[in-house]
Amino acid sequence: GSEMCIRDRARAVNMIEKRFEELNERAYERGYNTFSDFLNIEEQSVLKSTYLPCVLFGGYPMAERVVAGFGDDLNGEKFPIVCICVKPLMQKFADELSHRDFLGALMNLGIKRELLGDIIVKDNCGYILCLEHIAPYICENLERVRHTSVKCEKSNLPNDLKNEPEPTEIFAASKRIDVVIAAVYNLSRNETSKLIKAEKVFVNSRLVTSNSYMLCDNDIVSVRGFGRFSFDKEIKTTKKGRLVLEVKKY
């Protein structure tokens, strides 16, 4: 069973690597930019391990799902990513809508997950980042989320979603990844090591499998099911030898 699993995973990884190599070759042979679909954190981890030159962007800083762009002179403007604002027609009669509700409504339209980036819910509106070519289809066909009638329009992300969150200070015994995650999310070390064992922890989009991995300044840590934070820096050591660390939770 588990051997089969490992073989299947290796085959899947191999296919993803090939796809990235093709995009890279096409960009440099033909002299134009090429772009992947949206990548989840595991796919980003595979991409990082290929060391191919590329730029990752998901429509705003710190997006979790990103598109890989290949070729020269790449900036955010060139990525084929659009933001759609989905808002209830009548807020006072609307259900309280969650990320899962918006994602479910899009899946019900038959839209593949890889065409969709992050979905951000704010003030009961959903901001959906998607590939440009699927945007008109979403705008024309997405009429309901749960039992709520909605309207869609292309929009920019609200400014406060584009901005970095405020830094917070945490106390930790060291910069080991299990210690820092436990401090950020108020977990026990035991719970944290289970998350690492279950391959749910990534640093800078690479899978981390060791509890004793030491974090460096500006590392971005993703914990499946909990969210992400940037580990900014060590501020000081207390008299009792504990570290005061600065992090930003996304």
Language-model segments: which ranges?
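N-terminal beta-hairpin/loop module of FHA
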Residues: E153-F171
